Amino acid sequence: MRASQWFLVTQKETPNDAEIASHQLMLRSGMIRKLGSGLYTWMPLGLRVLRKVENIVREEMNKTHAMELLMPSVQPAELWQETGRWETFGGQLLTMKDSNQREYCFGPTHEEVITDIMRNELQSYKQLPVNFYQIQTKFRDEIRPRFGVMRAREFIMKDAYSFHLSLESLQETYKDMYQAYCRIFDRMGLKYRAVEADTGAIGGSASHEFQVLAESGEDLIFYSDASDYAANIEQATSLKPPKANQACNETITLVDTPNQKTIDEVASFLGIASNQTIKTLIVKGKEHPMVALVLRGDDELNEVKATKHPLVHSPLSFIDEELILKTLKTPLGSIGPIQLNIPVIVDHHALAMPSFVCGANQADKHFINAAWERDAKYDDAYDLRNVKEGDQSPDGRGTLHCCRGIEVGHVFQLGDKYAKAMNASVINEQGQLQTMIMGCYGLGITRVVAAAIEQHHDEHGIIWPQALAPFQVNIIPLNGARSQTVKEQAESLYQQLKSHGIDVLLDDRNERAGVLFADNDLIGIPHRLVVSERNLEQGCIEYKSRTSSETQLINLDKVVNFIIELINK
């Protein structure tokens, strides 16, 4: 591609509304342009990168024998009403009506559509298992879209769906797709982790997220330093501590704590550490109006874990102070588990405390030297807390460390959630109708582009991994407009590299060298070749890698093979 015939528009200044590096650099390099809130046009340069991502994904999906199709973006409300998600998906579902007042949504995902297709197309176990994927535009009506294409309202996603009759078959396909995702991100040159994850609104029995590691990532990931264990903050657990192995010999004592309401205030007032206290949170229950969740004072409640307990209502709902005071006759800052006449669920780490300080269920009073069993009863012990850096890994191997990541892929074992709701069944080997079970496998095409930039950039611009770069090589002829020799040699080099299937940009614009070099660094082309009269007199071409500040001279007759070898490494 010749730059003089290409739409190459870069910006020196960083846009004011761009918060993170990928958003800034995608705008400055001319990859994207904003149309509206969370809506972006992919300009020619950005589209080249996007297509490379799609091609890698498509190749690896095809290797798993998944079949590509394309489903409508606009979906009828009836399908979503069958599964109940029309009401439960929330405000991110963009709904509309046609001229006949029929309701539709712009699909944020396609479980309902693919299940509807398969319940009509599949009749027999002989047709299973099957796996279909698409690369399609989605829309989620984010309240506050931000970070450019990282959290846009409209985005492109690869979503795949598999159908099975047995759990073993589902697990086999799940493993194949998991490995395909690993190959995809390996080919893209990304540093990532596959982590255990919550199934969230999609549902299902098991799931893994693929997280690109980046300091700007919104997700917290915990991983063991001595094993393969890794999970996001919602799912991460630590080694369960043993119960206190010795009884508390101190007498439980009621003390005054005037106007001390928070854990930190109580601990400071009593001259103790917060990890010597426990806190009691009152939430809505499934079968009971209220349920108490008890944690060690220095721990944070993991709301996702809490809602998985059979006694806790989902979504999690905290009881307001007025209702607590009216029902339990205790102000919020003085609640504790002793003689609390509602179900009490205790976190394992709180249960491991031989003694503790807790609210006395009287205004401005706390108990010290309280102990489980002797003083406080509970209904169940459960994992309720967010793990912390330094906790022991749940597999007993190593300690947990924390890093940040950007979720770019998510695979789920859905089970029969959607097939059962939509009566998607086939005749099994015994001649009976059997509900199918499903797997779901999503990958954010547009988000991968932004995540790659977050991981690969410097103060000058993008540093593309070779597989994603819009161009692999940039040839810059210096004074090519005035020197016929430079112009001809640059053209010859351009044609030779093209003939070997290499993506080459010939930057033949009539600009100063500094502008051409700065644009190359901003755009992030991995390999730069500079053709100049001075170097040609020595029979050389100047080479510079985007990852290095050093330049080197390559013999003219060796430069093509030199580039080919670099690209094929």
Swiss-Prot record:
UniProt keyword Secreted, yes or no: no
**Where does this polypeptide localize?**
Cytoplasm
Is Aminoacyl-tRNA synthetase there in the keyword field?
yes
Please tell me one Gene Ontology term that the record gives under cellular component. Answer: cytosol
Q: What InterPro entries would the database entry show?
A: aa-tRNA-synt_IIb, aa-tRNA-synth_II, aa-tRNA-synth_II/BPL/LPL, Anticodon-bd, Anticodon-bd_dom_sf, Pro-tRNA-ligase_IIa, Pro-tRNA-synth_IIa_bac-type, Pro-tRNA-Synthase_IIa_type1
Q: Which GO terms describe its molecular function?
A: aminoacyl-tRNA deacylase activity; ATP binding; proline-tRNA ligase activity
Top-level taxon of the source organism? Bacteria
Q: Can you supply a Gene Ontology BP term from the record?
A: prolyl-tRNA aminoacylation
Q: What is its EC number?
A: 6.1.1.15
Q: What is its main location?
A: cytoplasm
Q: What is this enzyme's catalytic activity, as reactions?
A: tRNA(Pro) + L-proline + ATP = L-prolyl-tRNA(Pro) + AMP + diphosphate
Q: Which UniProt keywords apply?
A: Aminoacyl-tRNA synthetase, ATP-binding, Cytoplasm, Ligase, Nucleotide-binding, Protein biosynthesis
Function, please? Answer: Catalyzes the attachment of proline to tRNA(Pro) in a two-step reaction: proline is first activated by ATP to form Pro-AMP and then transferred to the acceptor end of tRNA(Pro). As ProRS can inadvertently accommodate and process non-cognate amino acids such as alanine and cysteine, to avoid such errors it has two additional distinct editing activities against alanine. One activity is designated as 'pretransfer' editing and involves the tRNA(Pro)-independent hydrolysis of activated Ala-AMP.
UniProt lists the family membership as follows: Belongs to the class-II aminoacyl-tRNA synthetase family. ProS type 1 subfamily.
**Domain notes from UniProt:** Consists of three domains: the N-terminal catalytic domain, the editing domain and the C-terminal anticodon-binding domain.
Subunit structure and binding partners: Homodimer.
What name goes with this protein? Proline--tRNA ligase
The organism of origin for this protein: Legionella pneumophila (strain Paris)
Gene assigned in the entry: proS
